Amino acid sequence: MTTFNTNDDQIYPVERGLELQPIMRQVYVWMGFGTLLTAIVAYFTIKTSLINLAANPAVMLGAVVAEFAMVLGLSFGFNRLSSGMATGLFFAYAALNGFTLSVVLLAFSVGTVISAFAATAVLFGVMSVIGYTTKLDLTKMGTYLMMGVIGLVIVMVVNLFINSGPLDMIISIVGVLIFTALTAYDTQRIGRMAAEMNLEGDAVAKLGIFGALKLYLDFINMFLFMLRLIGGKRR
């Protein structure tokens, strides 16, 4: 049986077992493949007639709802899903995300997309290494970061109506900062889960997918806010 240390009142530094490094390697590999799949699907969608389908509001709404359902299924179905089902859901989500992101990417120049991706990759890499190696306990950051995400979404909705340029810039900066911090937080959380779990069979592969999803979401959201920050929209 897979068990977790659920004592949130006192969380001490965890001595990492020999199994931790291979699991983290799995996390990064799956996340990398997921990101690559997203990029391939987005490119294919933009270059084909699929972009017309992606631009359809009804289709886009259905795709977004499906994405939300997949994330919930992966996040809350850890103990119920097999590793094969979890892997399939993760890659289905990554592919569908490429389809929905194609419309967003089309609004920016190629140079802007490349610059934003490069900046995001460097920032993500640095913060993930920090989260993995730091001796500081980042646990308490989680609540504040989630509150920050909720507040950010609310402000973004408000700005849809007032369409403020300066506020949009602030939103972009804050968004990058929040998901930069979440990258370190989630990396440490995944590492601690790996060290605290009694790893048996399927649980190892499932943790790799679960961790990959967390870091994939951090990376994609950081990338989107970086795009907004750098700008360079096509006229």
Q: What annotation goes with each model-predicted range?
A:
Residues M1-R235:
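A hydrophobic alpha-helical transmembrane-helix feature that marks the membrane cores
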